[in-house]
Regions:
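Gly/Thr-rich phosphate-binding beta-strand-loop-beta motif of the actin/hexokinase/Hsp70
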Residues: 1-33, 65-72, 171-201, 205-211, ...
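Adenine-nucleotide phosphate-binding core of ATP-dependent small-molecule kinases
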Residues: 218-219, 229-278, 285
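Short glycine-rich phosphate-binding loop at a beta-alpha junction
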Residues: 53, 62-74, 148, 153-157, ...
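Glycine-rich phosphate-binding/hydrolytic loop that grips phosphoryl groups
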Residues: 164, 286, 305-336
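Glycine-rich phosphate-binding loop plus the immediately following alpha-helix
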Residues: 34-41, 138-165, 197-240
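Active-site neighborhood for divalent-cation/phosphate handling
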Residues: 71-171, 309-312
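Non-catalytic, solvent-exposed interaction/assembly segments
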Residues: 1-98, 102, 142-144
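Glycine-rich phosphate-binding loops at beta-strand->alpha-helix junctions
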Residues: 274-302
């Protein structure tokens, strides 16, 4: 693929990365002044966002215009589907039928891609073909292309966030003992069960950092900005603020922990010879104070680590500790 950079356009921030082998040659992050995802912005807000990104590209002195951009998981349909063993034409028909039942958009307004993950070599009983399917509403992909064209960039590819996360963490993933990538964003949280080159399951929870900040704001009667600062400073530390912050955030984190346990148990039941061995935290929520020890205690035999896509890379020192917020944009910047 020709040289390009990756851009991750989130509802609260925009991240840009250009990577050249082991070197990060350009990196930047700015706040999204609208605080919205692209699909609920007015035309004026889209133009203002495009101007923001133009200035961002100019500031980091990016020479090329080719870009690969992500579409948030909340705006796409992505799922692993299982079908009886059948021919490729039959499989294509079965996937189309399944999508027609599952996706709340007319078939002519959805762009679909799929890849066979696992196909039995021999049919013994009720073996299934495992297929990873992604469907993007055409209005969504059109909106992202139009925004990038407003910025005068050349979109080479749009993709959901999961492939970028897998590429970013490929060096530490294993097909024998899969990991759960816990992508803690502002608007939502993704849980992706993955091996090195294989996805076993993906789940999206419609709550993230914004929900936790609002809980803190309500509990302590604070403005949202101050609540965000409190959340970052004290987090899940039981010995801070007499444990009050811990008590506010605990139900949210317990919910996450419960989902992780369900995923791990379901995988173990299906793969007797293997087990989930690690949770990789990424996204802005990965920095929550006290999160790792709390999850480690809750999950018992599963290791919990912060995933750093910048590990082993040459990157500007001021961004070195911010790897988790750049995971998607870094994954987008890597050649397929």
């Amino acid at each position: 693929m020709p040289a390009h950079f990756g851009i991750d356009i989130g509802s609260t921030s925009i991240k840009i990365i250009k990577s050249e082998g082991k070197k990060i040659s350009a990196v930047s992050v700015i706040s999204n002044a609208t605080g919205k995802n692209l699909m609920v912005m007015s035309n004026a807000e889209k133009i203002a966002l495009a101007d923001q990104i133009k200035e961002m590209v100019k500031t980091v002195n990016l020479k090329g215009k080719r870009v690969v951009a992500s579409i948030p998981e909340s705006l796409v349909f992505s799922r692993i589907m299982k079908f009886p063993v059948m021919s490729s034409p039959e499989l294509a028909t079965a996937i189309k039928w399944e999508l027609d039942q599952s996706v709340p958009f007319p078939p002519n307004e959805v762009e679909t891609s799929w890849a066979v993950l696992e196909k039995p070599n021999k049919i013994k009983g009720d073996e299934k073909i495992s297929v990873y399917v992604v469907a993007v509403p055409t209005p969504v992909s059109d909106a992202y292309v139009q925004l990038l064209e407003l910025v005068e960039l050349e979109p080479m590819r749009l993709e959901n966030e999961i492939p970028a996360l897998m590429r970013a963490f490929s060096p530490i993933l294993s097909n024998d003992s899969p990991s759960i990538i816990l992508d803690m964003g502002a608007s939502g949280t993704g849980l992706i069960l993955v091996g090195k080159e294989k996805i076993f399951g993906n789940y999206y929870l419609p709550f993230g950092g914004i929900v936790m900040t609002k809980l803190v704001a309500d509990a302590f009667s604070l403005p949202v900005g101050q609540a965000e600062s409190y959340k970052r400073t004290y987090g899940m530390a039981k010995d801070q603020l007499e444990g009050k912050m811990f008590s506010v955030l605990k139900p949210v984190i317990d919910n996450l922990s419960g989902e992780i346990k369900k995923i791990a148990i379901a995988y173990q039941n299906e793969h007797k010879e293997s087990s989930v061995n690690r949770v990789i935290l990424t996204g802005g929520g990965a920095y929550l104070n006290g999160l790792i020890p709390y999850l480690t205690e809750s999950l018992e035999r599963i290791e919990v680590v912060i995933g750093d896509p910048f590990s082993g890379l040459n990157v500007d020192q001021k961004y070195k500790s911010l790897g988790p917020i750049f995971t998607v944009s870094y994954g987008l910047s890597i050649d397929i």
